[in-house]
């Protein structure tokens, strides 16, 4: 929406809710429902004559692996997923040809799941189970840019932009599994006799970037551009957070030259060259840190142990690439 002649503001928000029923596991194993279905022979009927599911218990299931449909019914996994995505922006033009824009985005997700394993189902060996989990994810992003463009003598076109971007990501949750439930109706956590597994993962990272770009073209014939940026990531060592990257490019639009006007069958002809560096930070969030983990027992006492050796020298992966291209067009669309 236009607040006044030099300011525009806007927002966009989306909310979704899903309920998903699925099998408990997708591993490549005969007991996993999805995998087991690939090994079913055509004459293995998953249903009895009365329409109910064929079971190993009464011998109605003739397959050598589990009946995938019966497995899913007796080991149900339900998920509830909430998703909120919202963006707000403000764009100002305080003077002619200058545009200043600020945008804030929030991406939030909440997922809960409930898994049950019914003890009456023979493949479960009269041993029930229950698992509950809950996870939250919040990703915040802010982008600020200032763009200035102008022309000189109707043939020199300039476009300059500087900006900053920040990302803050946080994820946390918990998961608890208990075993030993003896009744199909009471397959909740508190009905189990033992807690077989549990966890409460937390992970987060942040990025901060500053960048600039310049573009110039002369009479739509000669083009030049450059860009520089500095990126900081929490995934690297204390003295290795930052990486600097750049690129330059040139392009000659041959089709605009007078000596090319006679070639009517050639609708486009451009020669381009660019060179520069780019960075990659795709590693685990805490790869650079020495880590310890709990859950170990020493003489029946809770203990911790080293789970990862740190490396403070981890830094950005940098790639330098150069490209030369010839663009030709033969059809005028």
What role is predicted for each listed range?
Residues 234-240:
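Solvent-exposed loop/turn segments connecting transmembrane beta-strands
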Residues 2-83, 101-208, 235, 254-321, ...:
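Surface-exposed loop/interface segments of Gram-negative outer-membrane beta-barrel transport/assembly proteins
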Residues 91, 95-96, 214, 317, ...:
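Long hydrophobic segments that form regular secondary structure
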Residues 244-252:
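Feature captures outer-membrane beta-barrel proteins of Gram-negative bacteria and organelles
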Residues 224-233, 273-275:
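Transmembrane beta-strand segments that form the barrel wall of outer-membrane beta-barrel proteins
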Residues 208-218:
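Structured alpha-helical segments in the cores of large, soluble enzyme domains
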């Amino acid at each position: 929406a236009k607040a006044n002649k030099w300011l525009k503001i806007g927002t966009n928000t989306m909310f979704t809710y899903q309920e998903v029923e699925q099998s408990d596991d997708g591993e490549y194993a005969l007991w996993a429902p999805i995998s087991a279905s690939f090994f079913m022979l055509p004459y293995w009927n998953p249903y009895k004559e009365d329409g109910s599911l064929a079971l190993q218990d009464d011998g109605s299931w003739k397959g050598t692996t589990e009946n995938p449909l019966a497995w899913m019914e007796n080991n149900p996994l339900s998920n509830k997923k909430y998703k909120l995505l919202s963006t707000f922006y403000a764009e100002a033009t305080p003077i002619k040809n200058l545009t200043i824009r600020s945008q804030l985005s929030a991406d939030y997700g909440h997922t809960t799941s409930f898994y049950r394993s019914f003890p009456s189902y023979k493949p479960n060996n009269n041993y029930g189970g229950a698992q509950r989990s809950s996870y939250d994810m919040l990703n915040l992003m802010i982008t600020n840019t200032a763009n200035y463009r102008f022309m000189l003598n109707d043939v020199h076109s300039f476009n300059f932009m500087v900006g900053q971007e920040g990302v803050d990501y946080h994820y946390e949750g918990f998961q608890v599994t208990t075993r030993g439930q003896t009744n199909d109706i009471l397959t909740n956590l508190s009905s189990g006799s033992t807690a077989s597994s549990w966890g409460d993962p937390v992970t987060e990272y942040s990025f901060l970037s500053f960048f600039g770009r310049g573009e110039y073209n002369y009479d739509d014939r000669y083009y030049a551009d450059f860009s520089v940026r500095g990126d900081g990531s929490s995934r690297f060592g204390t003295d290795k957070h930052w990486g600097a990257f750049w690129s330059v490019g040139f392009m000659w639009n041959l089709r605009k030259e007078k000596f090319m006007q006679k070639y009517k069958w050639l609708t486009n002809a451009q020669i381009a060259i660019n060179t520069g560096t780019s960075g990659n930070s795709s590693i685990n969030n805490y790869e650079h840190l020495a880590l310890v983990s709990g859950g170990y027992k020493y003489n029946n006492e809770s203990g911790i142990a080293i789970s990862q050796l740190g490396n403070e020298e981890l830094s950005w992966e940098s790639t330098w690439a150069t490209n030369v291209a010839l663009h030709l067009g033969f059809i005028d669309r």
